[in-house]
Amino acid sequence: HTPIRRQRQMCIRDSSYINNKQLGSFSIDTSNDNKYVKNPFQKVDAVIMMDCSLCPVHKDTKNDFHKYVKKHSDTIKKNGIEPMLVMTWPYKNRPEMIHALRKEFIQATNENNILLIPIGEAFHLTNNTHPEINLYQTDNRHPSRAGTYLAAAVIFGSLFQKPTLGNTALMGLSSEETLKLQNIADLTVKNFYQN
């Protein structure tokens, strides 16, 4: 993914990151010459933004996180598209990060009136209720296959407000593990949007 902070120095030309016909097949960075390509056959309904887990809570990057969530949300809305933001997860070896992440992500989405996708909340719940499921790569930061499955389930539930329970896709995981992850995703989405 291209975190919001990597986009800080890029020059947004013609909103090419929204309207490019190769949407989803490239990264945006300062050396990538993204051209605006109008595609009359493709309408984008939503853009999901995601930053690193440390950026919203680190003293040196927190202000930029909020600045660029606003900037990109405004640009996306101006193009008639709904911006959304993924709440990232605490590091495996720093579970207390959830409290600061929750605060900063809720503040950013409330200030910009955008949807928050609570993946971090689902990771937190899984870590507390099913510690036998490893959601992380060996670096304790990036998601494992199980973490990716959980994230996808939370995104689906958040976007469509439908349960994932019963989905037969295993993604290389055991059916027992996917059942637990689906239950956690559904519970997280239900509880998060009811509050």
Where are these regions (language model features)?
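Alpha-helical cap/lid subdomain in secreted, periplasmic
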Residues: N32-R145, G157
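Charged, often glycine-rich, active-site loop that binds/positions anionic groups
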Residues: S15-N32
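Generic, ordered loop/turn and secondary-structure boundary motif
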Residues: R5, S27, Y136-Q137, Q161
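General structural signal for secondary-structure boundaries
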Residues: D14, K21-Q22, T61, A100, ...
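Active-site oxyanion/phosphate-handling segment shared across diverse enzymes
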Residues: T148
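Single conserved hydrophobic/aromatic residue that forms the stacking wall/gate
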Residues: H1-D14
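Generic surface-pattern signal
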Residues: I28, N110, N128, D186, ...
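Conserved catalytic region of serine esterases and O-acyltransferases that act on ester linkages
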Residues: H142, A153-N195
